[in-house]
Amino acid sequence: MKKLLFSSLFLFGSLVSQAQHEYTIEGKVEGVKDGTLVSLFLLDGNVGSTVAMDTIQNGTFFFKRNAGEDGLDKLSLMCTRNDDFPSMSLEIYATPKARIKVTGTNTLIHTWTVDSPVKEQIEYNRFIEDSHDLWDEYQRLSIKARSLRSAPEGERKALRAKEDSISALISKREMKLMQELPVSNIWMDRLYKLSMSVKYNPNFSYKDETLALYNRMNEAQKTSITGQEIAVNLFPPTVVKEGDKMADTELFDLDGKIHHLT
């Protein structure tokens, strides 16, 4: 009897503990075909792994998970196997006990509405809403790009140019918003993406503005993992090439003999 009571109490305690760490994501969308597969990815830095899948029926989908040890899950919702969707995702932040509702009226998933009590989500939503019209236009181009995979290079190049133009406008709006907001983890994530443009896009026009935003961070933020990644993008180390002049210096071997680099 005691063993049965102990087992029951242990099971009850486990269920209570699990419930305290659970969060749910409930979706209600229109304009999406029944049978559309929805994938939920858990993000760790720039790497994502599939943690759940559901099929949209009558415009609904549902996920239930336990939050990770740090208490905040960064998730990505995608419908990549459907050509009606852009090659983009919906970013979701989840914490224990959060009841998250996702709504949409079309297949433009990146701008579906996420109603959530999680503060990181609320802050992230501000960036999306600030450029909602541009993001929708960008997604429509992304969907069109799927149908042009076999089109002539000139046509695909023209489409990419339109995407780049819209992306630049989004960056401009985001930087203006970032000037008004306090520095936070979400803020730094946006700065990281801007720093990637500085590093890899030779046509990116806002390097000085990005550097000014970087200088808003305090030392603790600059020395964080994200802060260091931003710095590497903005201030890449100089690579010495063959033929470049090097500063000479004296080096001593174990026998005390002097050697020079040049």
Describe each PLM feature range:
Residues 228-260:
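N-terminal "domain-start" segment that seeds a small globular fold
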Residues 205-216, 244-249:
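Alpha-helical repeat scaffolds
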